[in-house]
Amino acid sequence: MSMINKEIGEFTVQAYHQGAFKPISKADVLGKWAVFFFYPADFTFVCPTELEDLANKYADFQAIGCEVYSVSCDTHFVHKAWHDSSERIQKLQYPMLADPTHALAKDFEVYIEAEGVAERGTFVVNPEGKIVAYEVNAGNVGRNADELLRKVQACQFVHEHGDEVCPAKWQPGAETLKHSLDLVGML
């Protein structure tokens, strides 16, 4: 079943963010663009490489009005311990959401019940709280923050320009397409 245009559910979870624990809720997400970046577990192998890659691009996400939330089924205490012990994770400036009850992972349909962890899922959420893009990778396949940034930018563009679409490999400032009978069979 597709998650596109699904409104995210109500939630309140604890996060580790900038040296402190704080609650994050759906109300904090609404009104701006957001990325929910689910990963299986703290203290693992592919996860820190992805989170570091995302940390290196965080300023670019912020510049386009997009907040990033990493999410695992670990507690906020485990997030802090990982942050304090890993040079890669110390680079994170975005909130690390704790989902020990699996409520978020279940709402986003990435919970692996037999393992008690989330799949490697990425969700772009618009300011109205609806999922507009997502992908779920196999556990051993890491994601690319540059491509995720491009996807968010494309989602923002089509959100603002409803009659235009972004073709493959589109980058901000590049040519877009408009729905037109003249294009049928011409591409």
Model-inferred region functions:
Residues 1-187:
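Chalcogenol-based redox active-site neighborhoods
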